[in-house]
């Protein structure tokens, strides 16, 4: 019979092969799901893995989706490596969007292009403020950061709804819950004509390099990771757990807020109730599929972007519910968790005893 046996040390091979095996299992389970739903599995897989790549416009949309996923995942990786469990990046994303939207609404057509920087800064500060609530409650009252950050997601959604249904509602918007469309001067510069992709993707890649340097080439980044991997050793070395907590959540909140600012000042162009698209939760999967490594998360962000686009296409072309995106994300996450058992364990055949 097959039996799991602990490895003497974690397998480096399976650490990086596990996400690939998890993706393969997700594809196989996805085929089974399409068959159960009475849909052509080949066409279903085409929606998820070919359509998002087949044209320049499709690649542009892929980058539009990947930008917020990558930025949020970078911040979450810093948190998770620091043993700080920020599950509320979605709320920080929303509050970053709200803060950025507030600045954008103050601009008029005569405002200078400097307002774009002000919008991005407001987004960063909005996300940091929302993450700071979690950090303060954890630091002051030892509140569980998982529950606090998660509950604050719903508070952020309510703040957004209040604003777009109330004081920020566009009087000329036919009673739709949305702000007026932001002035053209507030828009993030586009990379390609005829596409929604903006310079935000370049900013995200710059942040990848910055996080890599921070984590692997600075003493502060080393201290963050020691605090996460070995808290006792961290205290013995004199590293501050309070500093680690605040820094992790401020970085994570700042990246999530920046993602929110890029979203509302880019492809959306206004505030509405549909700003919360689930990027904050999907970025958790991005972070773990990418092994909490900045470069790995570039590839996992692209993969999860394909799931978002594939879900939209499956809904419009195959009549499947929009929740198919979440189903594929869940399949990937649980497959990864299952495959990760091979990192610390190995399968051995154990014969029956006489």
What are these regions (language model features)?
Residues 1-25, 31-35, 229, 236-243, ...:
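Cytosolic-side transmembrane-helix boundaries in multi-pass membrane proteins
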Residues 15, 19, 61, 65, ...:
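Alpha-helical transmembrane segments of multi-pass membrane proteins, especially transporters
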Residues 19-35, 72-77, 97-103, 124-129, ...:
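Hydrophobic core segments of alpha-helical transmembrane domains in multi-pass membrane transport
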Residues 31-52, 167-179:
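Interfacial/capping segments of alpha-helical transmembrane domains
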Residues 32-37, 47-107, 120, 124-146, ...:
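Single transmembrane alpha-helix segments in multi-pass membrane proteins
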Residues 56, 145-217, 350-353:
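Transmembrane helix-bundle core of multi-pass membrane transporters
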Residues 192-270, 294-295, 299:
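Helix-loop-helix "hairpin" substructures at the membrane interface of multi-pass membrane proteins
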Residues 250-330:
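Transmembrane alpha-helical segments in multi-pass inner-membrane proteins
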